[in-house]
Curated annotation (Swiss-Prot):
Residues 1-25 form the signal peptide. Keywords: Developmental protein, Glycoprotein, Secreted, Signal. This is Twisted gastrulation protein homolog 1-A. Involved in dorsal-ventral patterning, permitting peak BMP signaling by antagonizing the residual anti-BMP activity of the cleavage products of chrd. Functions to promote the formation of ventral mesoderm by increasing the activity of bmp7 and other BMPS. Seems to antagonize BMP signaling by forming ternary complexes with chrd and BMPs, thereby preventing BMPs from binding to their receptors. In addition to the anti-BMP function, also has pro-BMP activity, partly mediated by cleavage and degradation of chrd, which releases BMPs from ternary complexes.
Amino acid sequence: MKPSFLHIPAAALLLCSLWILPIYCCNKALCASDVSKCLIQELCQCRPTDGNCSCCKECMLCLGTLWDECCDCVGMCKPRNYSDTPPTSKSTVEELHEPIPSLFRALTEGDTQLNWNIVTFPVVEELSHHENLVSFLENVNQPQNVSVQVSHSNEKEHMCTVVYFDDCMSIHQCKVSCESMGASKYRWFHNACCECVGPECIDYGSKTVKCVNCMV
């Protein structure tokens, strides 16, 4: 019997073949990890466009909540035109359970030589861009269409501090990294830039990508 790892190059080749066109291609930053897993397990080998949907259910279950965003990566749905919606214009946000504000403040005080960039700005600026980007809330129990309000008397006193990691990372690694530094929330841009949001922030931090090695 051949070792199972020999299937990996074939899956990777198929993955790459689906990403040739830069405009009509899937969201690599968001989908790469899960798509690779499903292809390696050979759960998405059929082609609905050719009338063969024998694996559609298994493939959909494998991709889970990423099905809508990633089905085109495995040839299950029509390719989308991403030229009008670059990955940097979309992000996934989530509140973190049991944040540690004192830890976050300690790690973000003063200059650091670590692999992240600390950005501080007024809460007013944070809220002014509240609807600039499309964000997908991971927490399904969170109420939708919640309007964030801050009393005008205190707006000038509130400052929001966020941390951008220099390098690209998966959404799972982003969540784990932000939890480990005591952040209250995180924002993961679909180009794989990770932003940890501090306790003083009212919304989900900045909607601008500022990861020095992950800007595209």
